[in-house]
Amino acid sequence: MKQKVVSIGDINVANDLPFVLFGGMNVLESRDLAMRICEHYVTVTQKLGIPYVFKASFDKANRSSIHSYRGPGLEEGMKIFQELKQTFGVKIITDVHEPSQAQPVADVVDVIQLPAFLARQTDLVEAMAKTGAVINVKKPQFVSPGQMGNIVDKFKEGGNEKVILCDRGANFGYDNLVVDMLGFSIMKKVSGNSPVIFDVTHALQCRDPFGAASGGRRAQVAELARAGMAVGLAGLFIEAHPDPEHAKCDGPSALPLAKLEPFLRQMKAIDDLVKGFEELDTSK
């Protein structure tokens, strides 16, 4: 079955092409740390031959606590992104939270991301669609895979069909997430075979029901990522940090930066194997 290709500059993203890595850090903690992390990703992905898009947030507008670190903000964040692009020649993905942010952010980065908690906000979707940028839509934890076609349709009505879908798990009772591996193929089907990627970092989140910060299951990142890659996906979304225990956001779910290369070697091996299989139709 023909898969839709979404191009991010010279990077082609599709379910039947070699996977693209969307990776970086959760939130911009400082200019120097962003440079350090981006440089490591670029070095490793170039060594392994993996297409790469750098990810970071300039503002975490949905933190659980009012006291949690949010990021440097729009103006300073765009300056850091511009320096990363000029220094390393990378493509960049970041999220927006308000309609007014869509165009200023799209003027700097290559992919703008619709956060899971905001994925049904029509005003935000319309503003993002109007930019003409490539869009990454995070599937809300409370939305079934089959409902994602409605969000894609909103973007199409807004004149933008350059949409990537991203799964980051589904609510499983209170304060826990699980990933339905059958959901990936459903998302492909309802979106006209749009590229589907897997955010393994945020799928590992779990919470202290009375705490102010998210916990995580970093020790299981490789096994969950291997399971997702075995489905046959357009890309993998992963956040890493040189010192996860002291990261300012989602450290418990972050991959230790030093483990990036061996982790990606495993992901590439699985992706190469799965996409070397002949398509098998078991529906009839």
Swiss-Prot record:
Listed EC numbers: 2.5.1.55
Q: Name one GO biological process term.
A: keto-3-deoxy-D-manno-octulosonic acid biosynthetic process
Q: Which UniProt keywords apply?
A: Cytoplasm, Lipopolysaccharide biosynthesis, Transferase
The keyword Cytoplasm appears for this protein: yes
Where is this protein found?
Answer: Cytoplasm
The record's annotation in InterPro entries points to:
Aldolase_TIM (IPR013785), DAHP1/KDSA (IPR006218), KDO8P_synthase (IPR006269)
- Keyword Repeat, does the record have it? no
Q: One GO MF term, please?
A: 3-deoxy-8-phosphooctulonate synthase activity
Q: What's the catalysed reaction? A: D-arabinose 5-phosphate + phosphoenolpyruvate + H2O = 3-deoxy-alpha-D-manno-2-octulosonate-8-phosphate + phosphate
Q: Name one GO cellular component term.
A: cytoplasm
Q: Domain of life here?
A: Bacteria
Top-rank EC class of the record's enzyme: transferase
Pfam families documented for this protein: DAHP_synth_1 (PF00793)
Kindly tell me the pathway this chain contributes to: Carbohydrate biosynthesis; 3-deoxy-D-manno-octulosonate biosynthesis; 3-deoxy-D-manno-octulosonate from D-ribulose 5-phosphate: step 2/3; Bacterial outer membrane biogenesis; lipopolysaccharide biosynthesis
Which NCBIfam families did the record assign?
KDO8P_synth, PRK05198.1, PRK12457.1
Family per record:
Belongs to the KdsA family.
UniProt protein name:
2-dehydro-3-deoxyphosphooctonate aldolase
Organism field? Escherichia coli O157:H7
Gene transcribed to yield this protein: kdsA
